[in-house]
Amino acid sequence: MATPHHSRRGSMAYYPRVRAKRIQGDIRSWPEIEGQTKVQAFAGYKVGMTHIQMVDYRKNSVTAGQVIMAPVTVVEVPPLTVMSIRYYARGDNGLEVISEEWAENIDKDVLRRINKINRHKKGIEVKDVDDVRLMVHTNPQLVSGVPSKTPEIFEIRIGGSTIENRIKYAKERLGSNISFSDFSKPGNFVDVIAVTKGKGFQGVVKRFGVKLLPRKNRKHRRMIGTLGPWHPDWVRNTVPQAGQVGFHQRTIHNIRIIKFDTKDHVDDINVKGGFLNYGIVRNDYVLLFGSVPGPAKRLIKMRDPARQTRPAVESIEVTYVSRESKQGD
């Protein structure tokens, strides 16, 4: 009998490996924060990647204080519009909506998503409210790289301080726009929630990374050696099989914000010939360290970190941003 020499191929941590329900990621949990009242998430459109040179801010690094090169992802973050406020109370089945408060003027493009707006406002008392969230929508018409005019609608939790301050914060912003600076700043960490690139129906080698069978194997090499033993007489879910690859929702924890700038300085980031499959940036933008899930043009969401292990830094000095063409010339 052959001697086992390798652990199982592929992780069982992400099951079932099926397509995400929606093309935008869903924020399923919110960390508790202390300090000033603020929104705990934001959304933007993935533009592409480039590289920068910056002063190494890590005190214990061998290159501390020196100029190093780093890969970054460019995310265009136009303002989000607050269309309503939702008040939650904790019930037997978790948080339940007890009242909503809508803005007076709603963008006509929002009606592409919502058929009817119920403006009936139910009176509430502060003592009955356990959580306050903003219902916001994106403004894709501001983004030249995204052809859609239909806005995406989602909730953003308001955190920090007391419930009274959160309600006041929400009412001050009802019907107006919020920017990325209301959410976070360079040097802080965020969790990125997005849907990955879709790869379609793929075999076991690409999907799980199983080993190719020997060259003289009958019929095929890119297959598994066996579906399992005679008994139990069913195929177990641990056996690698062909199926969907990609288009899964994933959360990447603790991604550092390297830089944030307004639309007045987009010339500092736009590359020659425009970003591949996107074009040029026209709105506020943010640089995130490393890569994030999804292709260009996809909406990604950024949330306050749920498992921050390293401290934030006050500022990051960026000395150079590559604006060379990404067209492969």
Curated annotation (Swiss-Prot):
Ribonucleoprotein as UniProt keyword: yes
Cellular component GO terms, alphabetically?
Answer: cytosolic large ribosomal subunit
One of the entry's Gene Ontology molecular-function terms is: structural constituent of ribosome
Coiled coil found in the keyword field: no
Q: How does it assemble?
A: Part of the 50S ribosomal subunit. Forms a cluster with proteins L14 and L24e.
Q: Which NCBIfam families match?
A: L3_arch, PRK04231.1
Family label: Belongs to the universal ribosomal protein uL3 family.
Entry function: One of the primary rRNA binding proteins, it binds directly near the 3'-end of the 23S rRNA, where it nucleates assembly of the 50S subunit.
Supply the name of the protein. Answer: Large ribosomal subunit protein uL3
* Organism listed in the record: Picrophilus torridus (strain ATCC 700027 / DSM 9790 / JCM 10055 / NBRC 100828 / KAW 2/3)
Taxonomic lineage: Archaea, Methanobacteriati, Thermoplasmatota, Thermoplasmata, Thermoplasmatales
